[in-house]
Amino acid sequence: MPFLEAGGAERFGLTTEEVALAVASHSGEPAHVATAESILEKGGFSAADLRCGATPPSDEASAAAVVRDGRPFSPLHNNCSGKHAAMLLACRLLGFDPATYDDPAHPLQRLILARVAFYAGHPASKIEIGVDGCSLPVFRLPISRLAAAYARLVAPGMLDDESPAAAKARRRAVAAMIAAPFHVSGTGQFTTRFLEAGAGRWIGKEGAEGVYAIGVAAPRLLGIAFKIDDGAARPRFPVAIDILSRLGIWEGGVPESLSGDVRPAILNARGLRVGEVVAAVPVEARADAAKGPPGDPVAGRA
């Protein structure tokens, strides 16, 4: 967000797809790799400058193609390469040292922490900092504050105490997610289909260890966040659909493109359906209009 606030997208001529990749957890497909490379080139950087580490693409077909071609896995395949590339450009723009952009004490990371605190409505001094899987600082928040942040992200107009530049940056990030869902996630992924189905009414994004967060702009402003306690990934999407169903967000029922995620099948080695994943745990919901941002933060654990 500090990069967009400072006019980085305009300064480096980033496309909508490149902005979307900068806020993505992508699946490492060839189009994602090419987009990350394009971001880097616009700032005079290369894959060698990324500090996210080399990983296989999470997209199985793409990973198999890399192995089949005898190519090494690259930091560009890392699902966070887009945001790392954008951080390098932010350093170039703001005059910061790009070699240590992942250090929690780096001035760019301090700016990012301040924006997280602002949108979450939570003091920066109370946010604990760890190290994420991609080596960037990761911020520990109450789950209700993550929900509040997503409500603020999709809120119309300007928020209280939000600068015009910050509001413009926020709207640009959200607009990119809506316009380029594939670049936020990947082929066939839930988040891609979820963004497409929303048609501008909501955004959503997964996090590691069973986290999912949603910002709903219509039919009413809502922020939703939850974490699967044991960190499992497979319950996230049925839980997300179940919460939205309970809140009456779907108009005309669950979109057809998401119907397979309502109760995903568990298949055995022969492809026989032997079970299903069911969202069956009540979700705690609470709204705190006095302390939180506009909209209802809905938080839960499953």
Question: Residue locations for each model-derived region?
Answer:
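Generic secondary-structure signature for well-ordered alpha-helical cores
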Residues: 9, 41, 45, 93, ...
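Glycine-rich ThDP/TPP pyrophosphate-binding loop and its adjacent helix/strand module
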Residues: 125-128, 149
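General structural feature for long, well-ordered alpha-helical segments within catalytic domains
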Residues: 32-36, 84, 108, 112, ...
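Structured C-terminal helix/loop/strand segments within mature extracytoplasmic catalytic/sensor domains
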Residues: 151-302
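Active-site-adjacent helix/loop patches that line small-molecule binding or acyl-intermediate pockets
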Residues: 14-126, 134
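Secretory/export targeting leaders with adjacent low-complexity proregions
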Residues: 136-139
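Active-site SXXK
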Residues: 1-9
